[in-house]
Structure formats: C-alpha cells, structure tokens
C-alpha cells in the first residue's frame, strides 16, 4: 500500500502500480531528456523510438492515477516533448499550453554554440496538460439520466432553463463540437436533479491564477540555489506550479523525484506528496532535504 509524504527508491513504472486510479490531484514530472545531459541515465535508450515508447508507458500510468480534471506538468527538451504530444489524446489527456522558461544568456556561457548551426537554446519547456474532464462528463450525466428515467425536457425544467434546441442539457450531453464542462453552480444543480454525490472539486480543473504570470517566465533564477543534481529545478519554479494547480491538502505525484525539490515545495505549501527516485544517491539526498525541511519551524 502506498503511503503519503514519502519517496520510494524504485522505478516509477513499478511504483505507480500501487497508486489507486484517479487519486492524484497534480503530477509534476521531470524525466530524463534523452541525450541532452552528459550522464549515463540520459543515454539508456538506443533510439528515439525506444525513448518515446518508454515515455508513453510512464505517461499512461500518470494518466491512470491522475484524477479527472487533474493537472500534469511535464518538463523536457522541446525536440523530444513534441514527439510525445501525439500520444496525449489516446491517454485521455489534453494539452493546455506550453510554458517557456527563459534561463538567460548565462546558460550558454562557454558552449561552442556556433557548431550547432541554430540559435542558442536558453529556455526550459514545460507542457501544461490536464486529464480531460469533458470526456468524463457526457457519459456520466447520460448514465444518471438513464438510471432515473428522465427526459431532457424534464431535466431542463428541473434546472430552471428553457428546452429550446435541447436546452442547457444538450450543451453537456449532446453532439457539440465544442465540448464544455459545467460551472460549479450548474454542477451542484445537476447533482441534485440527477441524485449523485460527486464533489465538483474532484472533477474540475484546479487553476489558481497568479497576477503577472504568463506562459513565458523570465523571473526564475536557475543559479541562486546550490545544485546537487545536474537537472535540478529551482524551488521557486516548482512552487509556482504546485500553487497554480493544486490546493492545500491535495496529493502531488513526482515520478522522477531527483533530489526532492517537488517534495520540499509540497511541504512548504501544505500539500501531500508521493515520489519515486530510482537512483540511490539522489534518493538519499532527497530524503535528507525533506527531513531538514520538515524540521524547519513554521509560523502558523
């Protein structure tokens, strides 16, 4: 049985099998980029297709454990991330946008960029993905309608809306090209009319807007923290993702925990976490960081 607020020293493909379906609110993944970092673990796939096949396997597990409407942030090198996008829909996932992080010119210092014959890469890419709740809502509502034997007209009347053109009911259960997900107010009404107990917070996307933050981030300093992992992400960056797409008490999954930055961010923001890290050295460092963070005094 998987425990909360713990990192496991094992392959995430095996470890995630112990996590229940639809139980994770947010997943943050920073997998190996493949032939980008000069480390053995970044060269363990012989071909591009081998790498993509492996990614689809762990992404399938993330999609399974992620709750309906849950968010999945995936870091990666743009060249390899684009190879994964075509598989998202088949996994029940929807790409919302790409977040670009400008690391500044310091990142190319000392590199022989001229021989690359391309513009110097000074960015990190993050795919902002959700588990598509629109695919869930239509069959769920239709199932409740059939169970209660109600007509569309009866449901619209109970909702207090007109039935012209199918009414409000057809927007969420009809054959609309532009699928929609109900507002909280309408969901609460539907739960009463159709007699179901499914909290809105467990099927709606969580997004907490942050003033002045767009899809291009240039305020993240990759050099102010001591690095104990070659692809370590700044705590400020991870905290921003956590706070944007989860609430206090939610469960955050990190399949590639590295040295525990996501977990430290969860402790600081009062989220629960589950993590996996295969490398024993990094795992030990992550556990040490988390222990130190938990020992810090809190103001509240």
Where do the language-model regions lie?
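Positively charged, low-complexity nucleic-acid-binding target-recognition regions
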Residues: 4, 291-300
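Core catalytic lobe of class I
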Residues: 2-275, 281-283
